């Protein structure tokens, strides 16, 4: 099997089979990641460029490490120190990178649709590392990988996503991906942070966290994205935590073996208290490790589309 597109722009347009193929490949990549040498020659001679217009620690670093673990040449463009600061357009920047022989461009941008625009104008494969409030497909893939690793499958699982759904590209990608793999997804958060289009996605929408948590197999907290919000969407972080914080008492409504996830960075004491973050039910650190494996898989699959090679 090969991925149909040269790019990974979102999970909305992927089939369930393609998603599962990526996740299966990530299993093999995790073996490499956990090996003593953490090195494989699969991407030798390939060049991976990270182009981030927004701040990032986990996503950018994991892509860079994923590239190096597979023996690719990896380079990061600091937007503030590049010609972008002089007014260069995204398309011109992309074409410049393209002409230097890049095989993959990993882009994060504040504008929804920026990766799609770039992909239409370059020969290199483009991976969406987060575009505005639209999608964050690699985060959702690593979330699903983590769940399947612990639960065996997503089919039939109840997944509760709690928090700022409106501004969350992570929530959107997870909704697309998890529902395609058979999960029952519920969301909860302040009514001011609920997007109107949720009715079309087949998820259950609640305005109280308690309803969403009942018998949940997986609970995912989302970061309050203050940088994307206008004032007045909720009174204060303290009030948010009071009504939607995932403390031990509320989490008792979920199943006893429910997984606790968060895409990070976590606002400790707001979305989750430290006692939950650092508990045995929390798999937040495992998500970080799995993120490298998933991104290794994507880099491999996108750069080997025309070769017919298999990693297995």
Swiss-Prot record:
The keyword Transferase applies. Pathway: Pyrimidine metabolism; UMP biosynthesis via de novo pathway; (S)-dihydroorotate from bicarbonate: step 2/3. GO terms for cellular component: cytosol. It comes from Acetivibrio thermocellus (strain ATCC 27405 / DSM 1237 / JCM 9322 / NBRC 103400 / NCIMB 10682 / NRRL B-4536 / VPI 7372). This is Aspartate carbamoyltransferase catalytic subunit. Carbamoyl phosphate binds at residues 58-59, 108, 136, 139, 264-265. Heterododecamer (2C3:3R2) of six catalytic PyrB chains organized as two trimers (C3), and six regulatory PyrI chains organized as three dimers (R2). GO terms for biological process: 'de novo' pyrimidine nucleobase biosynthetic process; 'de novo' UMP biosynthetic process; amino acid metabolic process. SUPFAM superfamilies: Aspartate/ornithine carbamoyltransferase. It comes from the Bacteria. L-aspartate binds at residues 86, 169, 223. GO terms for molecular function: amino acid binding; aspartate carbamoyltransferase activity. Keywords: Pyrimidine biosynthesis, Transferase.
